Amino acid sequence: MGAAASRRRALRSEAMSSVAAKVRAARAFGEYLSQSHPENRNGADHLLADAYSGHDGSPEMQPAPQNKRRLSLVSNGCYEGSLSEEPSIRKPAGEGPQPRVYTISGEPALLPSPEAEAIELAVVKGRRQRHPHHHSQPLRASPGGSREDVSRPCQSWAGSRQGSKECPGCAQLAPGPTPRAFGLDQPPLPETSGRRKKLERMYSVDRVSDDIPIRTWFPKENLFSFQTATTTMQAISVFRGYAERKRRKRENDSASVIQRNFRKHLRMVGSRRVKAQTFAERRERSFSRSWSDPTPMKADTSHDSRDSSDLQSSHCTLDEAFEDLDWDTEKGLEAVACDTEGFVPPKVMLISSKVPKAEYIPTIIRRDDPSIIPILYDHEHATFEDILEEIERKLNVYHKGAKIWKMLIFCQGGPGHLYLLKNKVATFAKVEKEEDMIHFWKRLSRLMSKVNPEPNVIHIMGCYILGNPNGEKLFQNLRTLMTPYRVTFESPLELSAQGKQMIETYFDFRLYRLWKSRQHSKLLDFDDVL
């Protein structure tokens, strides 16, 4: 029940709005005719009176018309008779001249109104015909129930400027505009008579009852503008999102470049400054590391008695006696082996595979010195025992019973430490605590010469051990481990005079410089150079 009532109210409101639109359209067309043809001004008054009188009552009190889609406006002819007369005879539709049909279009600003609506009428079909100045058939002038006798003694309003002169009866029948015609007594807009707009086609439909199908034609320009606005808003939204993403990407890229350049700057400049400022602090902290702790001394568990003291002293004396005997025996055997003619004391090169381009080092040694023995060992998998066995085997191959006079250890490392094997770093603290490292250096000392009048030399290349005070401590601890053999350790800078002398002792200096220049290069294979 409520839905039906609301539906009827909606239909009534639509009907009233349609009636108001027709009245506004009638007045607009009348003003258009008055401006275009000043002599036909009475035609506009008749048109307004007809439109208003047809819809004077409310839509509820009027009977439903036969055709809701008829605008009931006539273009050819003038009104005859009073507005209150009812035609008694209705002729068939086929008789008499064909009326023109006017449609409502939404062109802007031809009729000012409070709702800013502008509605005008456009002639869409009909033929211009001349009719005699006699009374014609009566036509229905309004769908509201009142019928008028309309005659066509005049020519078309839009086609001739002489309608009112030829038909003076039309001027007598024209009533003045009433002030209750929905406020349509406003002054007409000035419009050039020669300027006429082409209007899009649209039919005005009165929707009052449900038995009439709805066939509304929306104006083409309004539909197009609506679609264009929607598409434009979507395009603007998409473009804004795309522009925002591009802006964020540019900002992120610029921030990444700035951060990368800043990190590079810190590596090139700031790191050196920080290193200079914190060198003393890092040196102090190095002594507090676990591997830098001094070796704890074992507690003396022996009884504090004279017997135990005498036993220890006698044991030490016996060990020293055996060591002296072994020392003398080994020294005599080495002297006998070195007495042969043409004997050259051997120089052993211990090369770690961790050194870049280490496989080319045996090819750049001095070719005029056959006493140089290169030994390349695997940094990842070799052990201290493997290295010692390889040194003994190469010495026996070179000359049986020969010992090392000079030795070069070419490996990676740094100030204060020596990187001999994987997970085996020689530092001044570790050579005192780790058993395998202590055993390696002691066995290596037994392979050094005992008949050399000068101390045996072990050169360190590939790193600068003495760049840190811990390097001197490391050398001192190694010398202590290798006693009673006289061994000295040297690690000069390669660009110094001592460094050049060390290089010339083992390498061809020209080939060594060439190898050094290609050591970290991937552009040229060293085999091609050699």
UniProtKB/Swiss-Prot annotation:
Coiled-coil intervals: none
Positions of the UniProt region annotated as Necessary and sufficient to elicit dendritic processes and synaptic contacts: 2-233
A Gene Ontology term for the protein's cellular component: euchromatin
Tissue-level expression: Highly expressed in adult and fetal brain. Weakly expressed in heart, liver, spleen, testis, small intestine, skeletal muscle, peripheral white blood cells and kidney.
Ranges annotated as biased composition (Basic residues): 125-137
Residues linked to a lipid group, N-myristoyl glycine type: 2
MF-aspect GO terms: calcium-dependent protein binding
Swiss-Prot/TrEMBL GO biological process terms: cellular response to amino acid stimulus; cellular response to electrical stimulus; cellular response to gonadotropin stimulus; positive regulation of neuron migration; regulation of dendrite morphogenesis; regulation of neuron apoptotic process; regulation of neuronal synaptic plasticity
Biased composition (Polar residues): 153-162
Family the entry assigns: Belongs to the NSMF family.
Other noteworthy facts: NSMF mRNAs expressed in the hippocampus exhibit a prominent dendritic localization which is mediated by a dendritic targeting element (DTE) residing in the 3'-untranslated region (3'UTR). Transport from dendrites to the nucleus is induced by NMDA receptor activation and results in a rapid stripping of synaptic contacts and a reduction of dendritic complexity.
Function text: Couples NMDA-sensitive glutamate receptor signaling to the nucleus and triggers long-lasting changes in the cytoarchitecture of dendrites and spine synapse processes. Part of the cAMP response element-binding protein (CREB) shut-off signaling pathway. Stimulates outgrowth of olfactory axons and migration of gonadotropin-releasing hormone (GnRH) and luteinizing-hormone-releasing hormone (LHRH) neuronal cells.
Descriptive protein name: NMDA receptor synaptonuclear signaling and neuronal migration factor
